[in-house]
A protein has these predicted regions:
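C-terminal (or distal) subdomains of carbohydrate-active enzymes
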Residues: 1-280
Length: 280
């Protein structure tokens, strides 16, 4: 897996469309390679690449007990579109062939066939496999995935000239995660959520305290449902939004870090519904 520099047809390219590919060149000219971090919990390697007039600093990070490799990209992009449109992509070769790809969409996921065009995915693309683990590619900020029989790709930079002639020049910071999962929609959603929501922390000195070493505001137990948002309401309550990921009926159990006096089901407009809700 790695970066690929593409030249695409200007006539069929725009800010919204990736044009017909004319040339694909792997970004493999590594001018510097160094160990960034060496430790029991985290190890990383940083590689510096040159591509045409641009440079890419790529850090590969592997952390303890993590199933995905984190790829931190810092690209100084200087390419300008003219007769051809320069495009930078990430390509993940597959060890198997497939024509089914799962992508997350608002309030769920969808499975699409492989086509020679980018399709939208909010945070991840997954190349589904009938037997065995499925390759998954997660992004923090890019949405144009392309599933093909033997690869799972993601467009990172598209230097189109329409409508803006200089849209992408400058420093781009992008984080990707590459790994494997079972192919289950809920597991993929949990993986993408975990990757994109870092732990917030506050350093301090050593002292005594009354709070437990670990706690949680809310957690969910469900076969196929996930939490998508937790927010306060105007009347002082807590609103928990969620969705079912597989198109099935699924019971949901929410556990809070405090006593719950009352609970009710509401729709997207916070109107009360008749769905059964129990508290204990």
């Amino acid at each position: 897996a790695g970066l690929v520099y593409q030249e695409t047809e200007c006539k069929t390219s725009s800010a919204w469309n990736i044009g017909r590919a004319i040339k694909n060149v792997p970004v493999d000219r590594c001018v510097e390679l160094s160990r960034a971090v060496i430790g029991e919990l985290r190890s990383s390697v940083t590689a510096h690449f040159t591509v045409e007039n641009s440079t890419a600093e790529v850090t590969y990070v592997l952390e303890k007990d993590q199933s995905l490799v984190r790829v931190e990209l810092k690209v100084d992009w200087k390419e300008i579109g003219k007769d051809i449109i320069p495009v930078l992509t990430w390509q993940t070769p597959l060890s198997y062939q497939t024509d089914a790809f799962r992508y997350d969409v608002p309030a769920g996921s969808t499975v699409r066939r492989g086509i020679n065009n980018d399709v939208p995915g909010l945070r991840y693309g997954m190349a589904l496999r009938m037997d065995g683990s499925s390759a998954i590619l997660v992004s923090d900020s890019k949405y144009g995935y392309r599933g093909q029989k033997e690869s799972l790709n993601l467009t990172l930079i598209n230097s189109s000239v329409s409508p803006d002639p200089y849209p992408e020049r400058g420093i781009h910071t992008i984080t990707l995660w590459v790994g494997a999962a079972s192919g289950d929609a809920k597991e993929a959603e949990d993986i993408a959520t975990g990757c994109n929501h870092k732990i917030f922390y506050q350093p301090t000195n050593c002292h005594h305290g009354e709070l437990p070493l670990e706690d949680s505001l809310v957690s969910v137990a469900s076969h196929s449902a996930v939490i998508t948002a937790v927010q306060p309401t105007t009347d002082g309550c807590v609103l928990v939004r969620g969705c079912e990921t597989s198109g099935e009926r699924s019971a949901v159990k929410l556990s809070f870090g405090t006593e719950v006096k009352e609970a009710q089901a509401v729709d997207l407009f916070e109107k009360t519904k008749d769905n059964a809700v129990e508290t204990d």
